[in-house]
Amino acid sequence: MNTSDIVEIQQLMALYGHAFDSPDRSLVAQLFTHDGVFDVTQQAGGSPTDGIDAIRAHLDRWQPLQPSTHNTTNIWVHEKDGEVRVWSKWILYIPADKSTRLGEYNDLVVRTPDGWRIKHRLVTQTVPKL
């Protein structure tokens, strides 16, 4: 992994917030591998969502809370056991109920022919505690 890879991965992390806040669900294909996992098992009643189509459907369930603002910060890209991992913090503001939520993403990212993609994203909410 070189500096160019790190910049591309950071751009991927930035696009995530825009994609989740946008009604344009085609952006999801620029984020996840076809068999990607969006894992919210750390949330109350959450379960993993497997595959791009299922992730799009998951986002559609959140549409009533739009507009929202997903922000990703403190992005740390590192190699561990031969895999590329990303650890970052997130801030989510939902104007509909004036709530702010904070948490962490722990990602496994892979290089595909189309660029870097998220293979597995574990979402943990830290504030408010669930």
Regions found by a protein language model. Give the residues of each.
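A beta-strand edge to alpha-helix "cap/lid" segment located at domain peripheries
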Residues: 60-130
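A solvent-exposed, acidic/Ser-Thr-rich amphipathic alpha-helical stretch
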Residues: 25-89
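Short, flexible micro-motifs
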Residues: 20-22, 54, 106
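Short, low-complexity N-terminal intrinsically disordered segments enriched in polar/charged residues
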Residues: 1-26, 30-34
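Charge-dense, low-complexity intrinsically disordered segments
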Residues: 3, 46-49, 96
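Alpha-helical elements of Rossmann-like donor-binding domains used by nucleotide-donor carbohydrate transfer enzymes
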Residues: 15, 54-57, 104
